[in-house]
From Swiss-Prot:
This is Nucleoprotein. The gene is N. Residues 1-402 are annotated as: Ncore. It comes from the Viruses. GO terms for molecular function: RNA binding; structural molecule activity. Ncore is globular and carries the regions required for self-assembly and RNA-binding. Ntail is an intrinsically disordered monomeric domain in the C-terminus. GO terms for cellular component: helical viral capsid; host cell cytoplasm; ribonucleoprotein complex; viral nucleocapsid. Its main location: virion. It comes from Newcastle disease virus (isolate AF2240) (NDV). Homomultimer; forms the nucleocapsid. Binds to the viral genomic RNA. N0 interacts with the phosphoprotein (via N-terminus); this interaction allows P to chaperon N0 to avoid N polymerization before encapsidation. Interacts as N-RNA template with the phosphoprotein (via C-terminus); this interaction positions the polymerase on the template.
């Protein structure tokens, strides 16, 4: 019978191989789009600044077509380069787009002077200026910047120009993080990250863009595979650049931490709390299939190479293989563990309609039981004596018992946890009431809200009246879903 299991493992491996791994796919079957990209042949600080503003205006213009917006955005991200044509060549390795380079020799009264090699007529150059002047209506001050008049300020030197350009590029890169996931809820996180870069001195306050301009840029990124391929090449280049050697790629490397593995949170949380915790629950036969699936997915991730962390940004179809519905029971167990062990999961909406309540409860109980357990491997490495181990376990148990007397301030996330915003104690009372009296009319929505509420209440310090030597695990949220048959996404 061992051959049957070997064949099954090989079948799983074949099913999870990367798309296109064997080659022979269709090439050249899609019509190629001509994308005009601007380059500047001058190193004059004022010309560079005018070039960056010109590209920014076209990238957010309401009259520009999609290829023109895409090319202007690529040009804007290359405006810091010494030789822009070489930088643009990195974006030219496309299967669905052909980049047409339009060279600009300089600017006269903010009007671009195109090189004769570009073949841009005077009429077309004037049309570019008209397009650049058509900004979104929300830009009431006639400029993409919140501060009026900054476009007309001549830079002092090349350093001033680069600081201005980097301020714009940083805001463009910030929009990439949620361009392919939760783009409609990106305003809060974008503002927070821009404020961070302002504190670090990477973004100057007077060069902050209107939110509508950032939204237009994000929409261009979302709709253009050519732009996203260029962005991924820049991200990989930033990771391969030594830290501290390039101001621009230091910024790209910092933004990379927000973009890497976007859309794969469930997969990595399952690995962290379902596999890496090495609990005895992994020996359950009902988890064998999910563990085998995780093994194949880890192999698939490695086979994707450098593009693996950017599957979502590239729109890679292999990303769907990493959806939590593919390993629902192990995912449920891991989220139960994470609900107790990691307060950072509070803002992650882990509840799914395919989650198994029994495995979620199992994860909660294992996490509570492991609160004062000793990692034998680490204890052996630290050479802890038996007395030291007993003392450590006793201290951990004592801290766990005394948490009820410590008031730890926490920020309530009512939308994400299903709780009200009336304060910690009011939220706890509301959640207890909901748990005790579930509304039969709410159905599945009530189950998801209660699961979030219970997970949040376990991370908060319980009331002193609830503090006991052996705290009881929280009640199971909602009706049992052990026999659910809906395993869709």
């Amino acid at each position: 019978m061992s051959s049957v299991f070997d064949e099954y493992e090989q079948l799983l491996a074949a099913q999870t191989r990367p798309n296109g791994a064997h080659g022979g796919g269709e090439r050249g079957s899609t019509l190629r789009v001509e994308v005009p990209v601007f380059t500047l042949n001058s190193d004059d600080p004022e010309d560079r600044w005018n070039f960056a503003v010109f590209c920014l205006r076209i990238a957010v213009s309401e009259d520009a077509n999609k290829p023109l917006r895409q090319g202007a955005l690529i040009s804007l991200l290359c405006s810091h380069s010494q030789v822009m044509r070489n930088h643009v060549a990195l974006a030219g390795k496309q299967n669905e787009a052909t980049l047409t380079v339009l060279e600009i020799d300089g600017f006269t009264s903010s009007v671009p002077q195109f090189n004769n090699r570009s073949g841009v007529s005077e009429e077309r150059a004037q049309r570019f200026m008209v397009i650049a002047g058509s900004l979104p209506r929300a830009c009431s001050n006639g400029t993409p910047f919140v501060t009026a008049g900054v476009e007309d300020d001549a830079p002092e030197d090349i350093t001033d120009t680069l600081e201005r350009i980097l301020s714009i590029q940083a805001q463009v890169w910030v929009t990439v993080a949620k361009a392919m996931t939760a783009y409609e809820t990106a305003d809060e996180s974008e503002t927070r990250r821009i404020n961070k870069y302002m504190q670090q001195g990477r973004v100057q306050k007077k060069y902050i863009l209107h939110p509508v301009c950032r939204s237009a840029i994000q929409l261009t990124i979302r709709h253009s595979l050519a732009v996203r391929i260029f962005l991924v090449s820049e991200l990989k280049r930033g990771r391969n650049t030594a830290g501290g050697s390039s101001t621009y790629y230091n910024l790209v490397g910092d933004v990379d931490s927000y973009i890497r593995n976007t859309g794969l949170t469930a997969f990595f949380l399952t690995l962290k709390y379902g596999i890496n915790t090495k609990t005895s629950a992994l020996a359950l036969s009902s988890l064998t299939g999910d563990i085998q699936k995780m093994k194949q997915l880890m192999r698939l991730y490695r086979m994707k190479g450098e593009n693996a962390p950017y599957m979502t940004l590239l729109g890679d179809s292999d990303q769907m293989s990493f959806a939590p519905a593919e390993y629902a029971q192990l995912y449920s167990f891991a989220m139960g563990m994470a609900s107790v062990l990691d307060k950072g999961t509070g803002k992650y909406q882990f509840a799914r309609d395919f989650m198994s309540t029994s495995f979620w409860r199992l994860g909660v109980e294992y996490a509570q039981a492991q609160g004062s357990s000793i990692n034998e491997d680490m204890a052996a490495e630290l050479k802890l004596t038996p007395a030291a181990r007993r003392g450590l376990a006793a201290a951990a148990q004592r801290v766990s018992e005394e948490t009820g007397s410590v008031d730890i301030p926490t920020q309530q996330a009512g939308v994400l946890t299903g709780l009200s915003d009336g304060g910690p104690r009011a939220s706890q009372g509301g959640s207890n009431k909901s748990q005790g009296q579930p509304d039969a009319g709410d159905g599945e929505t009530q189950f998801l809200d209660l699961m979030r509420a219970v997970a949040n209440s376990m991370r908060e310090a319980p009331n002193s009246a609830q503090s006991t030597t052996h705290p009881e695990p929280p009640p199971t949220p909602g009706p049992s879903q052990d026999n659910d048959t809906d395993w869709g996404y």
